[in-house]
Amino acid sequence: MSKFHLHIVTPKGTYRDVDVDILNIRTTDGQMGILAHHMPLASGVEIAEMNYRIDKDRYEFAVGGGFVYVDGDNTVTLIVNDIESPEEIDLRRAEEAKARAEERLRSKNPNVDLQRAEVALKKAITRIHVKNNY
């Protein structure tokens, strides 16, 4: 299978710079599998699980939203707010974040930012799922 170059960037800098066979990612346009020589594309990235394959190895991640750009030169740039592999995820911290977000969503306090709480809950659930399943 042909490979393409994947460059993953976070606010902290380069996270990964690898040649991969396929990138599976949830965009604002739906779930996508990006292969080598994919047509040019720019899309938002949802808070969700993401994976890529190198030969027979599959690498899983929790992604906190962002942007993906596929150029015409067989390079994909993924700019994300945050990204964690299962090894990097602190399960206790993710479960605590989930509980806090759920509490804020149940709150009757008019000062609670519900949209922010929903985003925090989605991120926590994604992190927990990636940690528990991979």
Pin down the residues of each PLM region.
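Extreme N-terminal tail/first-helix region
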Residues: 1-13
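Histidine (H) residue identity feature
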Residues: 5-7, 37-38, 129
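Compact, glycine-rich, soluble single-domain proteins
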Residues: 10-96, 100
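Acidic/glycine-rich phosphate/pyrophosphate-binding loops and surrounding catalytic core
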Residues: 84-134
